[in-house]
């Protein structure tokens, strides 16, 4: 299995898109905190407004995969982020969205430590337990500190802006329902993410 190294990421992206044996996929993880995030508001001059916020530091976590070709978003909900949950999330993705015949997913990932370990184990160990991933995925490593090259970051930004900013959540389950609903709308082919994630 090849590991494509993104020394010139935009050129590499164009090469991947032109390669008929590859289907481009962007992956990333995200936390949504239950604390109220205030981004704007109106209040009288001289007043001292208060903002309701849940008294705790709870969060819900997601591992996301977006296919620019279709705009489809797939999310898994790991309890934590490590190499084991990354492998589980990749498997969940390729089980839900089997790779087309005679193709592989070009899976773009950042340099999180658990991503590095996932790539090392799947590539170097070559154990039978990882064969399904090796048969379906080519890893593409983003340059360090380049979230602007991973458009799934914009998916997280839009989700926060349209669903969680300036909203009080009285329980973690309400936050999860809100985020799950937002992601569910993108679980089928759609123009919004197709446009957002193609760098056109």
PLM feature segments, named:
Residues 1-200:
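Short functional hotspots at interaction and active-site rims
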């Amino acid at each position: 299995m090849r590991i494509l190294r993104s020394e010139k990421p935009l050129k590499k992206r164009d090469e991947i898109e032109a390669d008929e044996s590859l289907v481009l996929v962007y992956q990333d993880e995200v936390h949504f905190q239950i604390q109220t995030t205030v981004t704007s508001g109106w209040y009288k001059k001289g007043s001292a407004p208060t903002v309701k916020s849940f008294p705790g530091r709870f969060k819900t976590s997601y591992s996301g995969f977006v296919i620019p070709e279709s705009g489809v978003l797939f999310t898994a909900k790991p309890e934590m982020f490590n190499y084991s949950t990354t492998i589980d999330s990749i498997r969940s993705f390729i089980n839900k969205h089997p790779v087309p015949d005679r193709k592989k997913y070009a899976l773009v990932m950042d340099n999180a430590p658990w991503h590095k370990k996932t790539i090392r184990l799947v590539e170097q160990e070559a154990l039978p337990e990882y064969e399904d991933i090796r048969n379906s995925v080519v890893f593409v490593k983003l340059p360090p500190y380049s979230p602007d090259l991973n458009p799934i970051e914009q998916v997280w930004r839009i989700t926060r802006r349209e669903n969680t900013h300036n909203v009080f959540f009285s329980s973690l389950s309400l936050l999860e329902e809100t985020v799950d609903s937002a992601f569910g709308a993108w679980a089928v082919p759609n123009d919004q993410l197709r446009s957002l994630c193609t760098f056109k």
